[in-house]
């Protein structure tokens, strides 16, 4: 339990940031699923368009510290390889 005023404030802020970060992570996962769905459908044009949006969201999330930069790079690399395999 937080005792000092500062630690109580940090606890309040942690609750808010956890909810916000969860929302951002969910958004990134949704964009990644859209790319996977386009790949499964075999539509390279849609997959490429979704990939551009997903990489933008993923990079922004990595810049904010929601994901490690290497994890973002790994996701991008694997999706890119799947899209190239469609051709």
UniProtKB/Swiss-Prot annotation:
**Is Transit peptide found in the keyword set?**
no
Keyword tags: Ribonucleoprotein, Ribosomal protein, RNA-binding, rRNA-binding
Which SUPFAM superfamilies has this protein been placed in?
Answer: Ribosomal protein S20 (SSF46992)
Q: Which domain of life is it from?
A: Bacteria
GO MF, any single term:
structural constituent of ribosome
One GO process term, biological-process aspect: translation
The answer to whether keyword RNA-binding applies is: yes
One cellular component (GO) term of this entry: cytosol
Entry's InterPro entries?
Ribosomal_bS20, Ribosomal_bS20_sf
- Physiological role: Binds directly to 16S ribosomal RNA.
UniProt cross-references to NCBIfam families, sorted A to Z: S20
So what family is this one in? Belongs to the bacterial ribosomal protein bS20 family.
Protein name, entry field: Small ribosomal subunit protein bS20
**Which organism encodes this protein?**
Marinomonas sp. (strain MWYL1)
């Amino acid at each position: 339990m937080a005792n000092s005023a500062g630690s109580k404030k940090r606890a309040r802020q942690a609750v808010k940031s956890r909810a916000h970060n969860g929302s951002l992570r969910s958004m990134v996962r949704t964009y990644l699923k859209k790319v996977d769905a386009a790949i499964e459908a075999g539509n390279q044009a849609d997959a490429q368009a979704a990939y551009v949006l997903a990489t933008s969201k993923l990079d922004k999330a990595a810049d904010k510290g929601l994901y490690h930069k290497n994890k973002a790079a790994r996701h991008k690399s694997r999706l890119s390889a799947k899209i190239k395999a469609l051709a």
